[in-house]
Amino acid sequence: MSVLCLGEVWLELNAATAPELTETFRAQTGGWGAGFCRQYAALGGQAALLAQLGADPFGRKLAARLAGDGVDCSLLCFTDAFPTPVVFTGADTALSYRAHTAGLALGPEQLEAAPFRGSSAFCFSSAGLVDSPLRLAHLEALAAARDAGALCCYLPRLAQAAPYWPQREALCQTALQFLDRADVLFLEESDLLLLFGSRELRTALFALFTGHVQLIFFYKKDRIFAFTRSVMASAAKKDQSPALVLYRMEKMGIHGIDLPRLREHVLEQLLSNDANTTECQGLPY
């Protein structure tokens, strides 16, 4: 496998109006990790999801859907102790039933080191960092990924995670604590606004390049930037999702040890609008 994602999977019941005003919902597979793995698999990559579902019809249905989309579900856990989480969405409203559910109950003792040794990258986001056993599982997973030499990639997605946190301030403080644990950051303007009070990356670069951080991708409205500690590149924004950029990194054979010596032309390849860029391998640094 090439990419491991840790997070939640929930049954998302979506409506065109506010949940309390609708009688019909469309059932979808929700959760950041599930969505990222599906995107990565659609590109032709191998993506495995580390998550826990309830041993109930909802959990089995979600697992079957993910497997049908090409996601490696061999690492999914199922429990009789907690139900599969459910989230109602509609009209810019998110009503989540996550407390005391299977996803947040996944603890560090349930993780094994072996899957990380076969992975090129470990990816996580902010929704699952809420105070719970799952947050501790993230710390364990980061340590296992680093020991295995896998890239640690953090996609904060704070605006998307905020509805699932009891307090926005706690979300931002927790995100700040996890930023420097990653090798690669995928940031949006809303992340910077919530963390640093500004949408301009130049005001935060010094603070961001600390700890393990060696590479930052910054998504603006119409442009994407890539920074190492020494070089920068940019490209017009089109379809270069984080999943696509990471897929290109995997295809090019970029590992953690390579990040400090990436050159501008490599960053340009990662950000390219040319779909054929995914076929490039072994680019010189």
Spans of model-derived segments:
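Hydrophobic beta-strand scaffold residues
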Residues: 47, 73, 152-154, 186
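Active-site-proximal loop/turn and secondary-structure-junction residues that shape catalytic pockets
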Residues: 128, 158-160, 191
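Catalytic-core regions built around general acid/base machinery
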Residues: 137-148, 173-181
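Conserved phosphate/ATP/ADP-binding segment of small-molecule kinases
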Residues: 162-230
